[in-house]
């Protein structure tokens, strides 16, 4: 028996995550763009980027933990990096086989915090989120949506690349993880194939029609364009060297735009 549709439906019911994100954008106006990247702390991505895969669930889990926590808890600016480092620890405990040593995390933060501060922040964040770390990230939906799209390696790589470009982008907080995943696949299809109609199969399994994906997809196209000019509001340095190497081999890393459907430009 195929339970995939039931699983996707269950994950989509966890709509509370969009409430966290909207609160975050409304209540934390000082955490915009560059500051948002500082909180995420791009240096801590090195832990995940050692792994040779297209996409890492721990990486997205860390960012979602940060955003959910900041949506409901006031933190002074000097403690923002501590939030990022501690979120890495929590994400690894939940998603990864290998968990970083606290002393190593202190080194990542240039010894700005003590071991006690990291452990106290871990306790605060876990209690604030009520130990609920199971809310879905785009990674949860990506594999299933790619299967529905009958993806090949090229489509898979570029879809994950589109998602990674969005990880540090403040304005993408408003979208549900399922919509980000579906939009990334739709955008990748437009890039690789000029334009291919969003199939009924994809619409059925993702729950989104083409019109519902256009706004999100257009933003992904804009990030793709800006990545090649160095004008990205966040930073592409969080992308793993493995990811960049794979996408470069496709010839699409920073070329995006020429093959897009005119509706996306």
Curated annotation (Swiss-Prot):
Keywords: Cell cycle, Cell division, Cyclin. InterPro entries: Cyclin, Cyclin-like_dom, Cyclin-like_sf, Cyclin_C-dom, Cyclin_N. It comes from the Eukaryota. The keyword Electron transport does not apply. Pfam families: Cyclin_C (PF02984), Cyclin_N (PF00134). Belongs to the cyclin family. Cyclin AB subfamily. This is Cyclin-B2-5.
């Amino acid at each position: 028996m195929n339970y995939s549709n039931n699983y996707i439906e269950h994950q989509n019911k966890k709509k509370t995550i969009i409430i966290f994100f909207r609160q975050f954008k409304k209540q934390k106006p000082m955490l915009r763009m560059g500051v948002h990247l500082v909180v995420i702390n791009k240096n801590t991505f090195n832990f995940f980027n050692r792994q040779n895969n297209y996409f890492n669930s721990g990486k997205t889990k860390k960012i979602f933990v940060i955003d959910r926590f900041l949506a409901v808890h006031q933190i002074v600016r000097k403690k923002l990096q501590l939030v990022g480092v501690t979120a890495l620890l929590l994400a690894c405990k939940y998603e990864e086989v290998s968990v970083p040593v606290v002393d190593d995390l202190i080194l990542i933060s240039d010894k700005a915090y003590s071991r006690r501060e990291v452990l106290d922040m871990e306790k605060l964040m876990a209690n604030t989120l009520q130990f609920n770390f199971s809310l879905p990230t785009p990674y949860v939906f990506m594999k299933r949506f790619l299967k529905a799209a009958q993806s090949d390696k090229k489509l898979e790589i570029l879809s994950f690349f589109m998602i990674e470009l969005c990880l540090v982008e403040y304005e993408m907080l408003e979208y549900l993880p399922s919509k980000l995943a579906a939009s990334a696949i739709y955008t990748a299809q437009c890039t690789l194939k000029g334009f291919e109609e969003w199939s009924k199969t994809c619409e059925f399994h993702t729950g989104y029609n083409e019109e519902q994906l256009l706004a999100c997809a257009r933003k992904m196209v804009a990030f793709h364009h800006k990545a090649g000019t160095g004008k990205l509001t966040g930073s592409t340095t969080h992308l793993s060297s493995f990811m960049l190497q794979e996408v470069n081999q496709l010839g699409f890393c920073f070329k995006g735009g020429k093959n897009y459907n005119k509706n996306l430009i």
